[in-house]
Design a protein with these regions (language model features):
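Conserved NTP-binding/hydrolysis module of P-loop NTPases
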Residues: 77-123, 214
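Short conserved motifs of the RecA-like P-loop NTPase core
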Residues: 220-226
Length: 226
C-alpha cells in the first residue's frame, strides 16, 4: 500500500550533502528501544537547512512509513489550520477506504473523537466552540495512537515558539511512530529522545551546491537563447 502523505513538501532533487545529519537522524529513529516513541529534534539558526533535512529524510524513508504528516507550526493559527486540513485529509482517506464501501461518517467522527463535527458529505463542520476546535486539532493525534497504526512519521516544522505546540494534545499518546521537530529554539531539545544541532554546510558540500545551481542556471540561459 502506498504511503499516505499530507503536506510533505516536494523533494529537492538538487539536495546536496548533509550526510552526517541524515545519518544522525536515522540513528535517533532506529536507536530507540522497542516500544519507545522516537522524537528527533533538529535545531539551529533560521534558514540553516533544518526543514530541508527533514524533507530529505522523509522522502528517503517513504517506504518505511504507512503515513507521513507535515504540520506547519510557526504560529498558533498556522498550526490550527494545518491540523484542521490534515484532519479533513484523513477523513477523506478513511472514507475512501471504508470496509463496507459506503462510509459511515458518524462512526468515523466517533473514532476520531470529533462526534458531531463531520457532516453527511464528509466535511468538517465549522464550529466556533473552543472545545470543538481542540477536538479537531487532536483528531490526527488520536488516529495515530490507535492500535496497529504504528509506522507513521509526524513532522512539526518551524516550532520557533515552544508554546504553540501542546505535547499533550498534539503529540500522539502512544509509544509508537516517529516525530521530527524543527526549531530555532535550543530549548526544543528537551522534547526529543535525541537532537541534532544543524550548522552551515561543509565547504565541499557548499561548493557542490553552488556548482549544481550554476549548472542549472547555465542550462536555463542556453534554453532561453535557443
Amino acid at each position: 500500500m502506498a504511503c499516505l502523505k499530507f503536506g510533505l513538501p516536494s523533494q529537492n532533487l538538487q539536495f546536496t550533502g548533509r550526510i552526517k545529519e541524515l545519518q544522525l537522524l536515522s540513528a535517533i529513529v532506529e536507536g530507540a528501544g522497542k516500544g519507545q516513541r522516537k522524537i528527533a529534534v533538529l535545531h539551529g539558526l533560521g534558514g540553516i537547512g533544518k526543514t530541508d533535512i527533514a524533507v530529505q529524510y522523509a522522502w528517503q524513508n517513504l517506504a518505511v512509513y504507512t503515513s507521513v504528516w507535515w504540520i506547519r507550526s510557526a504560529t498558533a493559527e498556522g498550526l490550527k489550520r494545518s491540523l484542521m486540513t490534515a484532519t479533513q485529509h484523513l477523513i477523506h482517506h478513511l472514507a475512501a477506504n471504508y470496509a463496507s464501501g459506503q462510509p459511515d461518517y458518524i462512526v468515523i467522527a466517533r473514532d476520531l473523537g470529533i462526534a458531531g463535527l463531520i457532516d453527511a458529505s464528509g466535511q468538517l463542520v465549522d464550529s466556533a466552540e473552543s472545545n470543538d476546535q481542540e477536538r479537531v486539532e487532536g483528531a490526527l493525534s488520536k488516529w495515530l495512537s490507535m492500535d496497529g497504526n504504528d509506522m507513521w512519521l509526524l513532522v512539526f516544522d518551524n516550532v520557533d515558539d515552544l508554546k504553540v505546540v501542546d505535547k499533550t494534545r498534539h503529540f500522539p499518546q502512544c509509544s509508537s511512530g516517529t516525530i521530527i521537530i524543527t526549531s530555532r529554539r535550543r530549548g526544543s531539545v528537551h522534547w526529543g529522545t535525541g537532537s541534532i544541532q544543524v550548522e552551515g554546510l561543509e565547504k565541499d558540500d557548499a561548493l557542490s551546491l553552488l556548482l549544481t545551481r550554476a549548472s542549472l542556471d547555465q542550462e536555463q540561459l542556453n534554453a532561453t537563447g535557443e
